[in-house]
Each structure stands twice: as C-alpha cells, then as structure tokens.
Amino acid sequence: MMSSASAMKAVGFLLLLTILTLAYAKKSGDVTELQIGVKYKPQKCDLQAHKGDKIKVHYRGKLTDGTVFDSSFERGDPIEFELGTGQVIPGWDQGLLGACVGEKRKLKIPSKLGYGDNGSPPKIPGGATLIFDTELVAVNGEPSSEAKSKNEL
C-alpha cells in the first residue's frame, strides 16, 4: 500500500506530465478540427466555389514548424480539381467551400483531414497538421471580375 506522501508525489508527477503534454501539443501548432482563416476577400464576390465546381487554386503547404513541402506559387501553376469529390485531401474539400474567386484563406488541417497517420513520405510525416495558404484563382474556368478587368486593359 502506498503512503499518502508517495500518493501525493505520484499525483503531482501525473499532473506535471499532463501539463507538459498539453503545453507541447499547443506549442507544436497541432489542431484537432479544421480551422479556416480568411486573409483576403474581394469586395465583390461574383463567383463562389461549390461542391462539384472545377476550381483552380494556388497554394503553399507547410508543416507546423514552418517547413514548406509544396508550393504552386513557386511553380507558377495552380492546381485544378473538382471540389467536394475526394480528388484532394478532405481538409481542402471542406476548407475551400464557399470561397470567392480571388479570396485568400489560411487552412489549418488536422491529420485526420490531411494525410492521416501514414503521412505522405518523405516530406509529410504521419500525424502531421498541415497549414495551407490558398488563393482561389478560378471557378469553372472563370477568373474574378477584377482579374478580367486587369486583362482587358
């Protein structure tokens, strides 16, 4: 049987371990639910992304430590896919719904809506929270009215 002093030490140790674990999880930037931050939204929203739309998106993907693992901005070639049909990770299918053409969003995607426990080696480890800076370029081949007017000049 444990003495009350030993029990108090054990409880104190478990409490310290719990606090350190929570502090590390918070510090690491991991999230458990999808977080969508709108960084820029055009004044006029002519086109919004809906399930089944073919959309073009520029993106920069990072890990929580800031390591960039992919960037269409660097390549100058946005990705094109049908929204909401599983052609991309679930965090994108959910995180880009309702975005306006020209809108910039920051998506913090938990592992369960990204690449899961397996990751996408070698650049994305298993269980990784992903951070994407995105810009919706076009919906069904149509750019924003702002982009159209710039091209007409």
UniProtKB/Swiss-Prot annotation:
Main location: endoplasmic reticulum
Subcellular location(s) per record: Endoplasmic reticulum lumen
InterPro entries listed in its UniProt record: FKBP2/11, PPIase_dom_sf, PPIase_FKBP_dom
EC number(s) given by UniProt: 5.2.1.8
Keyword flag Cytoplasm: no
GO aspect biological process, one term: chaperone-mediated protein folding
GO molecular function, one term: peptidyl-prolyl cis-trans isomerase activity
Signal peptide: 1-25
Segments forming domain PPIase FKBP-type: 52-140
Catalytic activity: [protein]-peptidylproline (omega=180) = [protein]-peptidylproline (omega=0)
Superkingdom per UniProt: Eukaryota
Pfam families assigned: FKBP_C
UniProt keyword terms in alphabetical order: Endoplasmic reticulum, Isomerase, Rotamase, Signal
Recorded GO CC terms: cytosol; endoplasmic reticulum; endoplasmic reticulum lumen; secretory vesicle
PROSITE patterns attached to this UniProt entry: ER_TARGET, FKBP_PPIASE
Residues spanned by motif Prevents secretion from ER: 150-153
Family note: Belongs to the FKBP-type PPIase family.
Function, in words: PPIases accelerate the folding of proteins. It catalyzes the cis-trans isomerization of proline imidic peptide bonds in oligopeptides.
Identification of the protein by name: Peptidyl-prolyl cis-trans isomerase FKBP15-1
Species: Arabidopsis thaliana
